[in-house]
Amino acid sequence: MENQARVVGVLPMSISAVTPLAGTIFQDSRIPLRIWFPAIWWFTSQKNGASAQTLQRVLGMSGHEPAWLMLHKLRVAMVRPSRNRLAGQVEVDEAYLGGEGNKQLVGVAVEIKDNGRGRMRMQTLTGRTSAEVKNFVQQHVEPGRTIVTDGLTSYGCLADDGYAHKPMRKSYGEGNHDPDADNLLPRVHRAIALVKRWLLGTSQGRLDHKYLDAYLNEFIFRFNRRTSRARGLLFHRLLENAIAVDPAPLQKIQRTHKI
């Protein structure tokens, strides 16, 4: 009875704020679920990325902005809050991605798997400093794993944090680039080539760096599920994530708040 009284006591104050969509990416959306569901189904069926203009046409929407916001909310949902970090041996490097004259440094990590099905992670960086690469690796790779890199000296700090660091080449400073990195780290550079081509096709070279992390999340979701042949499973996974993640207002979608 005490528990029942406590529950009843809070209902009059909170019932107006409680809806089945509260705490999900659908919170405060003016678009009904009967539009969201076909949008998610269409979104997960696109292999080469999705544009707001195409979604607007497919759904018969009157404006571009609602379609644009829907896609970005779905990109937020493509990152599961409790997703597992990479394991085993992991290749790590950096690359500049984005539109012409508006490129951003990005950390890239790919698992080394004999079957070629290693997962990947990407995230924008502010530089090639030890602090930046350390933070990137700690967020995305399990402790104690082997990190395979080129000779960038910034990665030397990883050994102090329980990682086995395996540089594939002699050391060089933060301001330089290893010309043989493509051969030394084939998996990560294959992924970099793929995401560059994908971004060009998705954004037509007009990508605003504020939204780069959001687009990278979409690419990672698709890349890590590239062997899946069941469209329904992708739809189900994204819908699960959409319910599990926090609401995604515009300020969260922009890179001022990392996704």
Predicted regions and their residues:
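Residue-level recognition of single "structural anchor" positions
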Residues: M1-I259
